Amino acid sequence: MQSISVLICVLLALSILNFTVASLTQRPIYAIAHRVLRNEAVTAALSHGANALEVDLTAWYFGWWADHDGKLFSAGSTARDLFKFIAQKQWTKDYNISFVWLDIKNPDFCRKGRPCSIEALRDLAREILEPAGIRVLYGFFETAESRGFKVIRDGLNSNEAVVLSGETSTILHLYNISGAGIPVKQMVMDFGDSWLRKGVDIYPELRYGSWKRDHGKLGKVFSWTSAQGDTEMVRYLLREAGIDGLIYGYQTDEYNDKSGPKSALKDIVDFVEAHSDTHRMATEDDAPW
């Protein structure tokens, strides 16, 4: 009887060991819902299975708004309201939100002390998102020389990371001259195109970025924007370029509960499930940085 108990313990230990080894050899993949600007888009993305959200943010004189275009009637929710809704979803434990990617359109619009300043945005994220266990990725597209970038860089905490967009050599140079003090794991790059299949040099740039990541020069490498019909490109980038995930959804429209985003997400999930020996969808147990 004792030998049976010992055998059971050994088998359980081996099972746990095998699971641990598998987890360490599988790349966690992030499916990042594109242009999530309203509560209903959050609900749709999470119900579809997204494990991260991309939110465009524009500063107006009276605060920050989820807004891609910065036009008179282009804004969605306020940043505060959207963050609160996202955090509420996470608190329910029904969803897996690893991080929110804040694509900041005008980081230097306001000076410190105003509700439209970069400090005010960071304070909102720390007040609402981070206590819910949601990490924050600050995106600076062609604004690595901005005051906003420097503020985020100089006050970065362990829940936060920075992402710069462009060719790998350019990104490495920018991090070298402007990213002093940022831990490598919190240096993220992205490269892509609104029309993924038509993008120029997407594969070689992402492959080079992944190679630099594997050699300790970058933390994560993402691409964008995978849409319905980009199946082969998604497979190629995940398999051959070795990226960590994609922004998916519509190329130029807000996320919604329709077939387009669902199909784009399915491309990512289907690849991961078909390559479970090397890939898995990231969960709350995976620290992206």
Curated annotation (Swiss-Prot):
Residues annotated to bind Mg(2+): E54, D56, D103
Required co-factors: Mg(2+)
Signal peptide: 1-22
Motif SMD-tail, residue numbers: 282-289
Keywords linked to the UniProt accession: Hydrolase, Lipid degradation, Lipid metabolism, Magnesium, Metal-binding, Secreted, Signal, Virulence
GO cellular component, one term: extracellular region
Main location: secreted
Catalytic residues (positions): H34
Molecular function terms from GO: metal ion binding; sphingomyelin phosphodiesterase D activity
EC number: 3.1.4.41
Cofactor: record remark: Binds 1 Mg(2+) ion per subunit.
Known regulation of activity: Sphingomyelinase activity is reduced by 33 percent following addition of EDTA.
The keyword Protein biosynthesis is annotated on this UniProt entry: no
GO BP: lipid catabolic process
Group of enzyme by EC: hydrolase
Reaction catalysis annotation: a sphingomyelin + H2O = an N-acylsphing-4-enine 1-phosphate + choline + H(+)
Keyword Hydrolase assigned: yes
Cellular compartment(s): Secreted
Domain-level remarks: The SMD-tail motif is highly conserved and may be responsible for structural stabilization.
Functional summary from the UniProt entry: Catalyzes the hydrolysis of sphingomyelin. Sphingomyelinases D are produced by some spider in their venoms, but also by arthropods such as ticks, or pathogenic bacteria and fungi. They might play a role in pathogenicity through different mechanisms, such as membrane destabilization and host cell penetration, but also pulmonary inflammation and cutaneous lesions.
Family per similarity comment: Belongs to the sphingomyelinase D/phospholipase D family.
Full protein name: Sphingomyelinase D
Species of provenance: Aspergillus flavus (strain ATCC 200026 / FGSC A1120 / IAM 13836 / NRRL 3357 / JCM 12722 / SRRC 167)
Lineage: Eukaryota, Fungi, Dikarya, Ascomycota, Pezizomycotina
